[in-house]
């Protein structure tokens, strides 16, 4: 709980058995009330590990619904348990959970209703090992999207995001794609509705177990 706001962390998972526990152990439970993990029909024991860690809400898809479909389940469940602030955190340990508290404070203090953990602000991406081709593609796509949307975000492709429940209730995210383009569609919906979006610099880690969109699919949108 943070300033009377119920904080819920949602974790869209796919074969995250190797990294889930260390990600979970860094979540700041001094403010986080509940955690939701959605296993998108992965082939490992992610769901079992989540249950053993004490995660109360573990949902297993009966078939692979895709990255966007996974997020829809996450957000729908968070709203159903009356979350006031919802933080999406990938369980692949690429993003540090230690920033959750800072992101939530920004929303709880009504500075911004949406906060993105940006890998591009500062030197987080390259220092953390982001491949050069991904960094260049990210910068090019972000430039194009900023021009298209008349915005000045440092990136549109981060998987570390925090939302007020009001925001989630007022956009039709369930109408979006079930694939990776979901993230960009969601940001476009927020901008269309006039919501201000804040950013916070986020150090990242790139290693074999960390999952991310591949180069080819990043150009779908």
Where are the language model's segments positioned?
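Short, acidic, metal-binding catalytic loop of nucleotide-sugar glycosyltransferases
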Residues: 25-33
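Hydrophobic helical membrane-anchoring modules
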Residues: 1-4, 18, 25, 148-151, ...
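Short beta-strand-to-loop acidic/aromatic patch adjacent to the donor-nucleotide binding site
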Residues: 83-94
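Conserved donor nucleotide-binding strand/loop of the catalytic core
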Residues: 33-36, 47-81
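A conserved hydrophobic helix/loop-capping motif in glycosyltransferases and polysaccharide synthases
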Residues: 7-16, 23
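A short, conserved beta-strand element in the Rossmann-like catalytic core
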Residues: 41, 66, 94
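Acidic helix N-cap motif at the loop->helix transition within catalytic regions
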Residues: 18-22, 44-53
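Acceptor/aglycone-binding surface of glycosyltransferases and processive sugar-polymer synthases
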Residues: 63-80, 97-180, 206-217
